[in-house]
Each structure stands twice: as C-alpha cells, then as structure tokens.
Amino acid sequence: SVAVAGAIIKGAALTFNVLQ
C-alpha cells in the first residue's frame, strides 16, 4: 500500500541521513 511504501521510504531516508 501507499502507507507502507511511504514508511519504508521514510525509514530509508532516516537511515541515509544517519550514515552520512
């Protein structure tokens, strides 16, 4: 669903920000 996809993208973005 869109909500699940949004949560995954949000999580990926947060992880990416932490790794930088």
Curated annotation (Swiss-Prot):
Subcellular location: Secreted; Nematocyst; Target cell membrane
Source organism superkingdom: Eukaryota
Residue numbers spanned by region N-terminal region: 11-20
GO BP terms in the entry: killing of cells of another organism; monoatomic ion transport
Residue span of region Plays an important role in the hemolytic activity: 3-12
A single MF term (Gene Ontology): toxin activity
Assigned keywords, A-Z: Cytolysis, Ion transport, Membrane, Nematocyst, Secreted, Target cell membrane, Target membrane, Toxin, Transmembrane, Transport
GO cellular component: extracellular region; membrane; nematocyst; other organism cell membrane
Biological role: Pore-forming protein that forms cations-selective hydrophilic pores of around 1 nm and causes cardiac stimulation and cytolysis. Pore formation is a multi-step process that involves specific recognition of membrane sphingomyelin (but neither cholesterol nor phosphatidylcholine) using aromatic rich region and adjacent phosphocholine (POC) binding site, firm binding to the membrane (mainly driven by hydrophobic interactions) accompanied by the transfer of the N-terminal region to the lipid-water interface and finally pore formation after oligomerization of monomers.
Recorded domain comment: Composed of a long N-terminal alpha-helix and a core region rich in beta-sheet structures. Before the pore formation, the alpha-helix binds the lipid membrane, partitions into the lipid-water interface and stabilizes the monomeric molecule on the membrane. Finally, it traverses the bilayer, thus forming the transmembrane pore.
Self-association and partners: Octamer or nonamer in membranes. Monomer in the soluble state.
UniProt similarity note: Belongs to the actinoporin family. Sea anemone subfamily.
Protein name (Swiss-Prot/TrEMBL): Equinatoxin-3
Species: Actinia equina
Organism classification: Eukaryota, Metazoa, Cnidaria, Anthozoa, Hexacorallia
